Amino acid sequence: MKERSTELVQGFRHSVPYINAHRGKTFVVMLGGEAIEHENFSSIVNDIGLLHSLGIRLVVVYGARPQIDSNLADHNYEPIYHKHTRVTDARTLEMVKQAAGLLQLDITARLSMSLNNTPLQGAHINVVSGNFIIAQPLGVDDGVDYCHSGRIRRIDEEAIHRQLDNGAIVLLGPVAVSVTGESFNLTSEEVATQLAIKLKAEKMIGFCSSQGVTDSEGNIISELFPNDAQKRIEDLEQDGDYNSGTVRFLRGAVKACRSGVRRSHLLSYQEDGALIQELFSRDGIGTQIVMESAEQVRRATINDIGGILELIRPLEQQGILVRRSREQLEMEIDKFTIIERDNLTIACAALYPFPDEHIGEMACVAVHPDYRSSSRGEMLLNRITNQARQMGLKKLFVLTTRSIHWFQERGFTPAEVDVLPIQKQELYNYQRRSKILLADL
């Protein structure tokens, strides 16, 4: 008998909201030359084809830095840099054109066959390249002529949108022409960033050798705000890292984020399926640069009752929380604060004030099992504490059977029933024997 697994079913159920959310949106995907050289590149291209089949509008930008350096080395020609930017003289430009041209043909071919050996075999992917970008020279800096190194002068976003409307993937590289007919070498991060901004893309996606940005202990930082990302760039540059995939993408992501691109994602090109895991799961797998966190701490509304019930029911069944009916929750919803992530309630807590006695109760504290190892409980405690202070309360108490040490570590001390408000003393359940913990505000 064939073995059955529900993993596929669960994965599909979790991904469907993201499939619907992403359909019709514009994503700019930046592929550095290092990613293209890696053995996992075929899988990345296949996943890009899969995104296209789901109705996502895709602009793919490729770089060629290592390929250009390899061409120069083959001709015993030393690359020239000024302020960490390549100086593209006439000879170097020929190597740039050669590398970029070969990559364009190779990526086009791979995208064209990316849906082979899948249920979508036979579906045609139209890949379009062209002179959508007009370049201009960088010019002369400190007496150094950058020659054919350039920057973007303008982008024909209307023409690109027409191609996307027609169902094509737009593929653009590091070479663009000027109004005078000259060719210029651009950086892939500038191309990707400016395209994301001009096209009002929903996302910009880049790849690096690691799984994203990590902290000092090697843990992935799932979310960075632009100022934090800028600080990380400065730290890396101080260590001499000016041109790694991480630094180049972060520079572009900070600019894109501040210019209206909602999220920029940095992923590993070495991990198979990283693109799919990042885009179709709640927590992703890499690092996002965002202006606004995917999580929100806010007061609950009547529309949140279903999510709160789903969160607290398992804890009620285990006897950890006192059971609340939907009707009770509806009447008390204004007491609740929740943490929401991508429309899922992942944590909640309630504040019941007793203003005559200048004391409040923090109750119904619950955190989704997938997020208990993080600081969500601390976030709720801080928010409830601030609310209590704003109400003029002097003390905060909790009744708990399981989280005694957690609250004690945060300034709560054991207390007796007589410290509770009179109303609460009358309702105290001596059979449940909850521990009473009290904190001064």
From Swiss-Prot:
Keyword set includes Ribosomal protein: no
Location of the protein in the cell: Cytoplasm
Principal cellular location given in the protein's record: cytoplasm
EC class name: transferase
Pathway: Amino-acid biosynthesis; L-arginine biosynthesis; N(2)-acetyl-L-ornithine from L-glutamate: step 1/4
N-acetyltransferase domain mapped to chain residues: 295-434
SUPFAM superfamilies: Acyl-CoA N-acyltransferases (Nat), Carbamate kinase-like
Protein's name according to its UniProt entry: Amino-acid acetyltransferase
Lineage: Bacteria, Pseudomonadati, Pseudomonadota, Gammaproteobacteria, Enterobacterales
This protein's encoding gene: argA
